[in-house]
Amino acid sequence: MESSVQNKPIIELRSITKSYGDKTIIENFNLTINNGEFLTILGPSGCGKTTVLRLLAGLEELDSGNIILDGEDITHVPAEQRHVNTVFQSYALFPHMTIFENVAFGLRMQKVPNEEIKPRVLEALRMVQLEEYAYSKPAQLSGGQQQRIAIARAVVNKPKVLLLDESLSALDYKLRKQMQNELKALQRKLGITFIFVTHDQEEALTMSDRIIVLRKGHIQQDGSPREIYEEPKNLFVAKFIGEINIFNATVLTRVDEKRVRANVEGRVCDIYTNLDVVAEQKLKVLLRPEDILIEELDENQSSKAIIGHVADRNYKGMTLESNITLDHNGMTVLVSEFFNEDDPNIDHSLGQKVALTWHEGWEVVLSDEE
């Protein structure tokens, strides 16, 4: 029974369009969000992600289309009457009020009886582990604590959906990492649908059940973090999510249903793809830095692999990154290897000749969009 409730759509955006003047930001946009889901809308600045959030919150009016919340059409329902709350990047806490009064503010505006307010506020503060700061002022709290207070204020009204607009971007790196874990744990505890807007790919991959990648108001890919990272649907998604190497390939022939023989940066090899291809067709072969295997060669040693030379090395703690310049065309390839101080073969010298390969089937093959 619980599973069916969780899979029930809580929000449906049906063919929504929004323009500012003569500039269309979102056009014929459709999206279904399930109950209890942590969904991230990810994209570069100007892609329309914040516009979608503001439309959901009722802070902007649609030009056309419909917004359905839990089966009810709320397209023309004012923001204050929607069961949706928003946590903004600035947190917007009232500096002259105590933390208790900040969290209680929305309840008082809704004329909730006084005897209900105190237990609800304290429960919300307990959820974010800040009950002991109830009678402090916002200025006495750290940035991370203020962020949690903003969340407590948003959830005390028991919304059906919580919207978060780049709400971790003001925090320093270490605190942001900590808050990513806390926010996801809180979402699981509350069971409320979270819709998080960010341009930070790492945040999206860390916290989300599902990611929507947006570009110029259009969905480029909709999937789990793993699908988005390991199986990008186009070059935009591939380039936007993490580091990736993009090799040029030319089709030679199809070997079987799964494999195509191709020339990949001077190396003839079999690549896995179900694309309908013809001889001489141009393709792109995509590989994450951690998926590439590197082998040192003597300078006069030949190999059927892609050949290059080590141009730079960067120690990253858990990993060692190598920039490899390909002999074939001077292209730079990024290779990431897990650091093992007992492995004598991992710390390659600058100028070292190397062979690059990968495990069959780990590559992503896309049509050449250029």
From Swiss-Prot:
It comes from the Bacteria. It is an enzyme of class 7 (translocase). This is Spermidine/putrescine import ATP-binding protein PotA. The complex is composed of two ATP-binding proteins (PotA), two transmembrane proteins (PotB and PotC) and a solute-binding protein (PotD). The keyword Nucleotide-binding applies. It is a peripheral membrane protein. It is found in: Cell inner membrane. It comes from Pasteurella multocida (strain Pm70).
